Design a protein with these regions (language model features):
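Conserved short strand/loop->alpha-helix "switch" segment adjacent to the catalytic nucleotide/phosphoryl-transfer site
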Residues: 5-15, 46, 93-118, 124, ...
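Glycine-rich nucleotide-binding loop
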Residues: 192-199
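Glycine-rich/acidic phosphate-handling loop/turn and adjacent ATP-lid/helix
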Residues: 136-173, 201
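Polar low-complexity intrinsically disordered regions
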Residues: 183, 201-202
Length: 204
């Protein structure tokens, strides 16, 4: 009997991510529902409000991560759910994401979410990320007070350079490169004054 996994490591990792996120979303959602019920029974307090906000944020981030890091196929995800995932992930943070929400195939949504994560990595002081998805292309435009492009992850993403020293905080670069390659696509990066663009074109 062979010990070789039936799936390649990245495909296996996406299944693990999907499973973990799926199994955590329900109990965290139940915590949020319980807090909402509790708030209706007792006087409002900052502590309860903070707990409820934290539960909502955790649930939204899990939904975002399930799309970004999970398994993907031709399943179509509705615009409302995708918009909630994006807004929940970055609500009240240093990154503002603008996107005219539309339904997307899960594999397209995964590419888009990973592109947003890559853009976030290049905006250490925060900024605005504008996303457009149309005509077989995903275009991301970002601007902020400061941009920073670490050579390792960006060279891997755009030129396919080896990136053996990848950390957990940079794994989205590896995944975006790999998932784009599955579509025979290569992300392109262009820099301008105060901002930059990441583009994936040729989606079928």
């Amino acid at each position: 009997m062979s010990d070789t996994p039936a799936k390649d490591p990245i495909a296996l990792a996406t299944l693990v991510s999907s499973r973990v996120c799926h199994d955590l979303i329900s109990p965290i959602g139940a915590v949020g529902n319980g807090l909402e019920l509790l708030q209706s029974l007792i006087p409002p307090s900052p502590e309860l409000a903070l707990l409820a906000e934290s539960a909502d944020t955790a649930s939204a981030k899990l939904r975002f991560f399930r799309v970004a890091f999970g398994a993907a196929g031709e399943e179509v995800l509705d615009a409302r759910g995708l918009a909630q995932g994006l807004s929940g992930m970055y609500a009240g943070g240093r990154i503002n994401v603008e996107w005219e929400a539309t339904a997307l195939r899960r594999r397209e949504a995964r590419l888009m979410f990973l592109m947003v994560l890559c853009a976030e990595s290049a905006l250490p002081l925060g900024g605005t990320v504008h996303v457009e998805v149309d005509e077989g292309a995903i275009r991301l435009y970002a601007e902020g007070r400061r941009t920073r492009f670490e050579p390792g992850p960006w060279a891997h993403l755009c030129q396919g350079e080896p990136f053996a020293e990848c950390s957990s905080a940079q794994v989205h670069f590896l995944l975006l490169r790999a998932f784009a390659a599955e579509e025979t696509l290569t992300p392109t990066l262009s820099e301008g004054e105060g901002g930059f663009a990441i583009v994936l074109s040729g989606l079928m």
